[in-house]
């Protein structure tokens, strides 16, 4: 079974992918820095969850 993400994490991730989708990669560390750059998220936990969700979505988009 997979993890269930909160709505605010999904909404933020989809917004980032819609606006800056071409700069995100399959690398979590790179995406973590980009999430910090493009958002005002102060919480480390929320930032990491958004970066992880973006990483998974980018990896799935590249496969198909």
Curated annotation (Swiss-Prot):
Pfam families for this protein: Ribosomal_S17e
Protein's GO biological process: translation
Keywords annotated in UniProt: Ribonucleoprotein, Ribosomal protein
Domain of life from the UniProt record: Archaea
A GO MF term: structural constituent of ribosome
Cellular component terms per the entry's GO annotation: cytosol; ribonucleoprotein complex; ribosome
InterPro entries, per database record: Ribosomal_eS17, Ribosomal_eS17_CS, Ribosomal_eS17_sf
UniProt family annotation: Belongs to the eukaryotic ribosomal protein eS17 family.
NCBIfam families: PRK01151.1
Protein name: Small ribosomal subunit protein eS17
Organism the protein comes from: Methanosarcina acetivorans (strain ATCC 35395 / DSM 2834 / JCM 12185 / C2A)
Gene assigned in the entry: rps17e
């Amino acid at each position: 079974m997979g993890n269930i993400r909160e709505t605010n994490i999904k909404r933020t991730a989809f917004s980032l992918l819609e606006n800056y989708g071409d700069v995100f990669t399959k690398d979590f560390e790179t995406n973590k820095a980009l999430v910090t750059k493009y958002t005002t998220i102060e919480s480390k936990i929320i930032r990491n969850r958004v970066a992880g969700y973006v990483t998974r979505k980018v990896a799935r988009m590249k496969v198909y």
